[in-house]
């Protein structure tokens, strides 16, 4: 989309539920009428529309999200895909179809047929060539791809996110903000990397680069955990695993020790993910991630103490799921690997008591049934 002319740049500040999520910065291609409509709806400068609502994206939501396709918003009148209004009136014609839907993060007009453009738009998350000739591409995301991915991967019901994805602020970028709009900036932990490897910019990814990035993400996760931000810590550990998954095995030109380093890091990230998932009461995930850690423990040459932690973490998850018998089995394995560990000993006592209490309750119920 190279063009010598200075293109408008706009932004959305996104909130998911009550959580501030981040900024999406967009650059508008010179499809003049379509781009001007979108720019003005970002600033709200046109005032009230014919439907009695402000011609402004602020406060509107992304009402339709389909993973591996797109995220859609812009209905600031009905909030459900049936409304919206352009600055020219309710609808305006398709301007041109010169730009193709050939990559993710393109900005395109939603419509209900030829010549029905209003205010609704979508951002692609994959190439969507079947939309060529039907929808007008008029911009692209230049920053905040991780925010788009976060929205794309939300839980939905009938394609609507279960939590509102709200544009809490929006507008046009000018001056230094314009110049800085496409610059990657680290988040609060210092993490400068895109959430998904497919969106990575900079040095080409290979096994060594992915190991380096995943190692840094583990450190960012540890720092978030120590600061008390468990959800962010878990997010960084899982992000690290995504980067490792890009190149699960080194190639023949990589250093020989890299294979063992990757396996050890994968074990640690799974085990740490289990720890934080349990603390967040995500016991199903906690058990799964501890199991993944244990599945890789021998290949990773994990120490007995670290394997004991993984068994312990899976036991805590099983206890949280009220599956105390499974928890006890894992705790007994952990005790073999780390005899005398006070945490394991205490958890065994706790689980045995839970089993005893459950059995007593079952006996009482049976006696009442047969009396």
UniProtKB/Swiss-Prot annotation:
EC code(s) of this entry: 5.2.1.8
Gene Ontology BP terms: protein refolding
MF terms in GO: cyclosporin A binding; peptidyl-prolyl cis-trans isomerase activity; ribosome binding; unfolded protein binding
Matching Pfam families: Pro_isomerase
InterPro entries: Cyclophilin-like_dom_sf, Cyclophilin-type_PPIase_CS, Cyclophilin-type_PPIase_dom, TPR-like_helical_dom_sf, TPR_rpt
Gene Ontology cellular-component annotations: cytoplasm; intracellular membrane-bounded organelle
Subcellular location: Cytoplasm
Catalytic activities: [protein]-peptidylproline (omega=180) = [protein]-peptidylproline (omega=0)
Domain PPIase cyclophilin-type: 11-172
Keywords associated with the record: Cytoplasm, Isomerase, Repeat, Rotamase, TPR repeat
Disulfide topology: none
Spans of repeat TPR: 214-247, 267-300, 308-341
Region (Disordered): 175-195
Function (record text): PPIases accelerate the folding of proteins. It catalyzes the cis-trans isomerization of proline imidic peptide bonds in oligopeptides.
Family to which the UniProt record says this protein belongs: Belongs to the cyclophilin-type PPIase family. PPIase D subfamily.
PANTHER family: PEPTIDYL-PROLYL CIS-TRANS ISOMERASE (PTHR11071), PEPTIDYL-PROLYL CIS-TRANS ISOMERASE D-RELATED (PTHR11071:SF561)
Name under which the protein is recorded: Peptidyl-prolyl cis-trans isomerase D
């Amino acid at each position: 989309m190279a063009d010598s002319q200075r293109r408008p740049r706009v932004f959305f500040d996104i909130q998911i539920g009550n959580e501030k999520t981040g900024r999406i910065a967009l650059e508008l291609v010179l499809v003049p009428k379509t781009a001007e409509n979108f720019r003005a709806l970002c600033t709200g400068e046109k005032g009230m529309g014919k439907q009695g609502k402000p011609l402004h994206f602020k406060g509107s939501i992304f009402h339709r999200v389909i993973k591996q396709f797109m995220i859609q918003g812009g209905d600031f009148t009905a909030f459900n895909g049936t409304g919206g209004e352009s600055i020219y009136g309710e609808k305006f014609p398709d301007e041109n179809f010169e730009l193709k839907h050939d990559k993710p993060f393109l900005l395109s007009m939603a419509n209900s047929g030829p010549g029905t453009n209003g205010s609704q738009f979508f951002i692609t998350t994959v190439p969507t060539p079947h939309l060529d000739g039907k929808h007008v591409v008029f911009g692209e995301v230049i920053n905040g791809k991780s925010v788009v991915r976060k929205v794309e991967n939300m839980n939905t019901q009938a394609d609507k996110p279960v939590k509102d994805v709200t544009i809490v602020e929006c507008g046009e970028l000018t001056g230094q903000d314009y110049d800085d709009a496409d610059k990657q900036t680290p988040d609060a932990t210092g993490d400068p990397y895109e959430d998904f490897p497919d969106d990575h910019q900079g040095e080409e990814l290979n096994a060594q680069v992915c190991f380096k990035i995943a190692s840094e993400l583990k450190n960012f996760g540890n720092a978030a955990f120590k600061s008390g931000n468990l959800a962010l810590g878990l997010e960084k550990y899982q992000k690290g695993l995504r980067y490792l998954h890009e190149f699960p095995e080194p190639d023949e030109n990589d250093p020989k020790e890299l294979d063992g380093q990757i396996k050890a890091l994968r074990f640690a990230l799974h085990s740490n993910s289990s720890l934080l998932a349990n603390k967040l009461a995500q016991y199903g995930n906690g058990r799964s991630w501890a199991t993944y850690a244990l599945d890789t423990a021998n290949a990773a040459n994990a120490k007995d103490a670290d394997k004991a932690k993984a068994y312990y973490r899976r036991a805590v998850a099983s206890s949280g799921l009220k599956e105390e018998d499974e928890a006890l089995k894992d705790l007994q394995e952990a005790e073999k690997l780390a005899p005398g560990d006070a945490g394991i000993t205490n958890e065994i006592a706790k689980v045995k008591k839970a089993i005893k209490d459950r059995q007593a309750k079952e006996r009482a119920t049976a006696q009442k049934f047969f009396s």
